[in-house]
Regions:
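Juxta-kinase regulatory segment immediately upstream of eukaryotic protein kinase catalytic domains
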Residues: 1-45
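ATP-binding pocket architecture of kinase catalytic cores
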Residues: 45-191, 202-209, 227-228
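Short proline/glycine- and basic residue-enriched helix-capping loop/turn segments at helix->loop/beta transitions
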Residues: 192-196
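Catalytic-loop of the protein kinase fold
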Residues: 212-214, 219
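Catalytic activation segment of kinase domains across protein kinase-like and atypical kinase folds
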Residues: 220-259
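Active-site activation/catalytic loop segments of kinase-like enzymes and analogous catalytic loops
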Residues: 245-290, 308-326
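Helical subdomain adjoining the active site within ATP-dependent kinase catalytic cores
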Residues: 290-354
Length: 354
C-alpha cells in the first residue's frame, strides 16, 4: 500500500555494558556517540517499565530539552536466543524514515541507544481514554500499511516464534523449584507441544490479512504526548509480518494490565469498545471515511480468534524467561495467567472455527 523502504546504516560501538555496573558502561558508550557531552553534566536514570530489557535515560544537563534525552536499552539476559537483533534495528530504522519509530543513535554489543519520545506510557486507565485510543488505532493502521523490502519474510512470524520458544523451554529447568512449579502447572513440554499443534490446526485457517505489525503493543510500549496530541510506539523487538487481527487482539489483551498483582480481566475491552476501535482503525487502514459494518464485524471476529494465539505465544515466552531472565518479575506466574486464560477461551473459539 505504501512505498517500499529500506533501512539505513547505523553507528556501531564496541562496548558491552555489564548489568552489574550499568552506569559506567553507559558513560563509556556516551563518550563514543555523544563526545561533546561533559561526563560530569550527564544525568542518568534507570527506567522500570520493561520486563525484558533494562533501560536508562541519559540527559545532558546543559540541554534543557526533553527531545535531547537519549535512551540506552541493555538487552535482557539470553534474549539473543529468541530475538533477531539485526532485524529489530532494521525495522526501527525503516519505520523511523516514515515517522513511525524513534531514531537509532548507536548500536553496541548488548543493546542500542535511541531517541526519547516525550510523554507518558499508557496505563489501564488512559488506554480507554477517548482522546487517546483513537490515536493508537490510527497509528497501528499506519504501521500496518507499511511494506518492507523483498528481503524481509512476509509469512506470519508467530508460528515460527512459538516453535522457537517451545524449543527453548528447558527440560528440565535448572532449578528444582522451577521444575516443580512448571510440572505442577503445565505437566510437560510434550503437552504444550500437542496443544500448540491443535491451536495451529484451527487458526491457520484465519482470513486475517498479513501485515507488517508491532506484535508487542503492551501499554508500556505506547507513548502519549499530551501537548502535541500524538501517539508513538516503541520497542520493535518482535516487529514482523503477522496477522492484522493478531496485532489488534494482542493490544486488547494488554488492557488488563501487566503487574502480576493487578492483572484484572474485567478490564478486557467490551464488544462495543472493540467495534469502535476497529472502525477507527479501518478508516485509516482502508483509507475510507466509513468502513462498512461487514468489514468491522469481520475484523472483530478475527480479533476474538487471534486473541487466543496471543495468550499462547506470551505464555510460552514467559516460560523461557522463567528460566533465563534476571529481571525482577514472576515469569512463572505470568505464564500461568496467560496460559490459563488460553485454556478458558479455547473451546469456545475452536467450536466457532470447526
Amino acid at each position: 500500500m505504501s512505498s517500499v523502504c529500506l533501512a539505513a546504516g547505523d553507528k556501531y560501538v564496541p562496548v558491552r555494558i555489564d548489568e552489574n555496573d550499568i552506569y559506567s558502561g553507559v558513560l563509556k558508550l556516551l563518550k563514543n556517540i555523544r563526545p561533546n557531552w561533559a561526563q560530569g553534566k550527564i544525568k542518568l536514570k534507570t527506567l522500570t517499565d520493561g520486563i525484558t530489557n533494562k533501560l536508562v535515560s541519559c540527559q545532558f544537563l546543559d540541554l534543557n530539552d526533553e527531545k535531547e534525552i537519549m535512551l540506552v536499552r541493555i538487552y535482557g539476559n539470553k534474549t539473543d536466543l529468541f530475538i533477531d537483533r539485526t532485524a529489530e534495528i532494521r525495522n526501527i530504522k525503516t519505520l523511523n524514515v516514515l515517522g513511525l519509530a524513534p531514531k537509532v543513535y548507536g548500536v553496541f554489543e548488548n543493546g542500542l541507544a535511541y531517541q526519547y519520545y516525550p510523554g507518558s506510557t499508557l496505563d489501564v486507565e488512559s488506554v480507554t481514554n477517548d482522546n487517546i485510543w483513537p490515536l493508537v488505532a490510527t497509528q497501528m493502521a499506519k504501521m500496518h500499511r507499511v511494506q518492507l523490502g523483498r528481503d524481509v519474510p512476509k509469512e506470519p512470524f508467530v508460528w515460527d516464534k512459538i516453535e522457537q520458544f517451545l524449543s527453548l523451554i528447558p527440560d528440565p529447568f535448572t532449578s528444582e523449584e522451577k521444575q516443580a512449579r512448571f510440572a505442577n502447572s503445565f505437566t510437560s513440554i510434550t503437552k504444550l507441544r500437542i496443544e500448540y499443534e491443535r491451536l495451529k490446526s484451527h487458526l491457520i485457517k484465519t482470513t486475517s490479512p498479513v501485515v507488517f505489525a508491532h506484535n508487542d503493543l503492551l501499554l508500556g510500549n505506547v507513548i502519549y504526548n499530551k501537548d502535541e496530541g500524538t501517539i508513538s510506539f516503541i520497542d520493535y523487538e518482535y516487529a514482523a509480518y503477522c496477522y492484522q487481527a493478531f496485532d489488534i487482539a494482542n493490544h486488547f489483551n494488554e488492557f488488563v494490565g501487566l503487574s502480576i498483582e493487578d492483572i484484572d480481566y474485567d478490564r478486557y475491552p467490551c464488544e462495543e469498545f472493540q467495534l469502535m476501535w476497529i472502525k477507527v482503525y479501518l478508516a485509516t487502514y482502508l483509507k475510507v471515511d466509513h468502513p462498512s459494518d461487514a468489514q468491522i464485524s469481520q475484523v472483530y471476529t478475527e480479533v476474538q480468534q487471534l486473541a487466543l494465539l496471543s495468550h499462547f505465544l506470551w505464555g510460552i515466552w514467559s516460560l523461557v524467561q522463567f528460566e533465563h531472565s534476571d529481571i525482577d518479575f514472576d515469569f512463572g506466574r505470568y505464564a500461568e495467567i496467560r496460559l490459563n486464560r488460553y485454556y478458558e477461551l479455547k473451546d469456545k473459539i475452536f467450536k466457532q472455527l470447526s
